[in-house]
Amino acid sequence: MANVKGPHSITSTLDRATGFIKRQKRNYSVAITRSAASSFLGNLTAQYDSIYTVGLGADSVLLGTIGSIANAISTLVSTPIGWLVDRYGIKRFYVLAMGLMAAGALVYALAPSWQWIIAATILLSVAMRLTGTGCSVISSDSVRNRDRATAQNLCVSIASIASLIAPLVAAYLITLSGGLSTEGIRPLYYIRFVGYGFVLIFVVLQLREPNRGRTDEVRASASFIGDFKQLFAGQTLLRRWVVVAALTGLPMAMTSPFMQFYAYEVKGADQYLLGIMTTAAVLTRLAFGIPLGRLADRVGRKKVIYLLAPLWYAANLLLVFSTNSATLVLSASLQTFYAVSSGMTSAMTLELVPTERMGKWSGALGLFRGLVAIPAPAIGGLIWRELGPRYVFLIPLVIDLVLRLSLLTTLPETLEAEPVA
């Protein structure tokens, strides 16, 4: 009986996921497909980017500085991109994003020194900002509030399926190319370049401009600055939410440039262990992403955020105090709950303003997130050098517990709320 139950359960899950996608608008399917392809391509190199950059001559401070440059560029373009999207539509900017991703991957592939990584980082940062704003607008238009958290986590879970084998494929290709070295990693960026080219063609052919209503009114509004003043006028909740959203991204902004490098340099992980760690994170997301999304859609986003915080705190603690490969893999698995929690925050964010203001709202959030995220990687590099590598992963936990979670308790649940702006 057990042998029958397992396959039946998988089939039932697939049927529910398919039914969920079909009842959303077409663009949601396009967004899922693009996300899955981009996730696979990104996961080919995600665990090696910092190692590759250090191999080109960077140290911990330069590694952090490059991360800060990425966040600064994302912040600079965030607000104008959001404003332009609201006025002129999303498709042209989404297509531009995929072109910039391809260009960024190519610069990585051709890089003879770490300075080239700055140029690649700039291209990829602008691309990520463009796709982030685009996803917000598409999700706001294509998905109902009661499906929001499920839609966010289903999108990521499907992307996880597509990227599940990427780390192990990458490890095999690196071995064929000469091992865990700069030249062994380099071919992966060429593969990303070609892959993004195909995704670009898909987006051009399949994406439709969202129907966001009141477009003429948005275009006729006063001015760039005036539009943003109007967005926040008298909206105490939105102002407070901006702080929560900015603090949500702080731990990852500070630790992400160093996580894989720490496992490699301090804990002695090789390319296969790094690949297994990434695969473990993907499997955890597949197992828990959709159920937690459904739970958040039933009981509220805030409760699930509180539930998940201790799990990703444990991930950083296990990474720091790990003594063997098993605890490194467990750490990577638990780190997934940070991404799930961030998805809950994103779901709440989309429920605070109407669709026709979503571009400006995403742009404003990007600006304020950036003001927090810009210095975070550079500070992480200084902490690595001056205090020691482990403190890069411990200090953000204290900040998150004391500031973000405390402030979140003062905000209302958005599950059944009407947009406030």
What do the PLM-derived regions correspond to, one by one?
Residues 2-28, 209-243, 421:
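Juxtamembrane intracellular "pre-TM" segments in multi-pass secondary transporters
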Residues 13-75, 237-278:
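Helix-loop boundary and gating motifs at the non-cytosolic
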Residues 65-83, 279-291:
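Central cavity-lining transmembrane alpha-helices of secondary-active solute carriers
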Residues 76-112, 296-302:
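Conserved MFS/SLC helix-loop-helix module at the cytosolic interface between two early adjacent transmembrane helices
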Residues 92-107, 193, 303-318, 397:
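Structural signature of the two symmetry-related core transmembrane helices
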Residues 130-143, 340-353:
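Intracellular juxtamembrane helix-capping segments at the cytosolic ends
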Residues 186-204, 391-408:
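Symmetry-related core transmembrane helices of the 12-TM Major Facilitator Superfamily/SLC fold
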Residues 202-218, 408-420:
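Helix-loop junctions on the cytosolic side of multi-pass membrane transporters
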